[in-house]
Amino acid sequence: MKNLDPWEAVIGLETHVQLNTKSKIFTSASTAFGDEPNTHVDPVVCGLPGTLPVLNETVLEYAVKTSLALNLNVAEHCKFDRKQYFYPDLPKNYQISQFDEPLAENGWLEVEIAEKDKETYLKKIGIERLHMEEDAGKLVHAGSDRLAGSKYSLVDYNRAGIALVEIVSKPDIRTGREASEYASEIRRTVRYLGVSDGNMQEGSLRCDVNISVRRGPDSPFGTKVEIKNMNSFSAIQKACEYEIKRQIDVYENGGEIFQETRLWDEAKQLTKSMRLKEGSSDYRYFPDPDLGPIEISKEQKDQWLNELPELPSKKRHKYVKEFGLSPYDSRVISDEVFMANFFEETVANGADPKLASNWITSDIVGYLKSNKQIFADLKLSPIYLAEMINLISEKVISGKIAKDILPELIKKNISPQKLVKEKGLAMISDSDSILPIIEDLINEFPKEVASFKEGKTKLLGFFVGQLMKKTKGKVDPKLANKLLAEKLNS
């Protein structure tokens, strides 16, 4: 009988995270990005006869910390293997990786999924393994973005030998949105740890998607296809959604899905066939004879575990439960470690959490974006933001004045209290100082006063505006409304 259960996608991600060490994984060659091609190459990177690789200790530390943050079981012993393949970007004709004895296995990551027009939900996505390996070089194809159609190709070995960790998820992901959110949470995690900048545009974080479809959760897995060339989280989501639809259409029209590697074409919003997918046997793995096995003591693991920072998922929970933020605001604030730390320090200095969140996510982020800066560039002290928020709460200044002075506070990193005093921006709060100004307004606009008394009470807003204009916004609007209403009705 034909299975008519709804189609279900089965998705797994292989995420390559470039570690931000100063030197490469097995040599002292620099990892600096953006320098002249082939200036960070040495005999070890090229695999010249007589050279021996030596593991960078910081790479091991960063890899173990990432494993622990992703709830993986770190092995007591692991080893490196040679993955053999011939391609111009690999000067040794093999890549040093880990095959059957990886650094860590069997972990998970809890991800918050915000699907369009659906309630946000939490999903625990399993992680199969994490292993260390070296990156390959970079090919630049002249006249095309890929080998096919290019006139010639240039190779830059600056990237070759840079340390990577590859994080392989279990096939627990079911939608493009889940895939995108999972990758995004991986990036948040490595940024919080400080082990990688996670910059997709520079290749510091790259994701390959393995995807198949089947009829319902009880059916066997279908033939999986690998998708490459996605350089943003939205591209991951769109590539998955396109490929799911493509595979379903093929099956429903009696076709066959082949195990292949496909490329995401951002311009055309579709996947293109690149090559048939190799199996692990095609790479002829064997233990690297130049690198001994690695042993990690329990004491060392415990030390690195204790050095882990509070991670984004825990911060989100804390911001909702302890600070009263909405799930959305807690997600925005915790998205970037610099922003989260700035927010917490602002609150620790006496600011209301909700007001601090609003000022940070709206006004400060808006200012930084307009000046093409990121949050890490912010020079403003959280002490001064807390001070400004409290000046508003104490009615020393209005929200409008605060918005006006914020750019200067950010540029100069100075006390808002001092700036308000120097510029005479403090609110006029005593009635005796405001009433003479109101008297002048009544004398200045006799027609409007007469119209108000005839019943056109909406003119009260006009008088409030004029009062604000004369005082440069330094009167509390509620007090202005009260005093004007009393005077006009007398």
Swiss-Prot record:
Name this protein carries in UniProt: Aspartyl/glutamyl-tRNA(Asn/Gln) amidotransferase subunit B
Species for this entry: Prochlorococcus marinus (strain MIT 9515)
Record GO biological process: glutaminyl-tRNAGln biosynthesis via transamidation; translation
Catalytic activity line of the entry: L-glutamyl-tRNA(Gln) + L-glutamine + ATP + H2O = L-glutaminyl-tRNA(Gln) + L-glutamate + ADP + phosphate + H(+); L-aspartyl-tRNA(Asn) + L-glutamine + ATP + H2O = L-asparaginyl-tRNA(Asn) + L-glutamate + ADP + phosphate + 2 H(+)
An example Gene Ontology molecular-function term: glutaminyl-tRNA synthase (glutamine-hydrolyzing) activity
Family per record: Belongs to the GatB/GatE family. GatB subfamily.
Function: Allows the formation of correctly charged Asn-tRNA(Asn) or Gln-tRNA(Gln) through the transamidation of misacylated Asp-tRNA(Asn) or Glu-tRNA(Gln) in organisms which lack either or both of asparaginyl-tRNA or glutaminyl-tRNA synthetases. The reaction takes place in the presence of glutamine and ATP through an activated phospho-Asp-tRNA(Asn) or phospho-Glu-tRNA(Gln).
PANTHER family: GLUTAMYL-TRNA GLN AMIDOTRANSFERASE SUBUNIT B MITOCHONDRIAL AND PROKARYOTIC PET112-RELATED, GLUTAMYL-TRNA(GLN) AMIDOTRANSFERASE SUBUNIT B, MITOCHONDRIAL
Gene giving rise to this polypeptide: gatB
Alphabetical keyword list: ATP-binding, Ligase, Nucleotide-binding, Protein biosynthesis
Class of this enzyme: ligase
EC identifiers of the protein: 6.3.5.-
Quaternary structure and partners: Heterotrimer of A, B and C subunits.
Record-linked Pfam families: GatB_N, GatB_Yqey
Domain of life: Bacteria
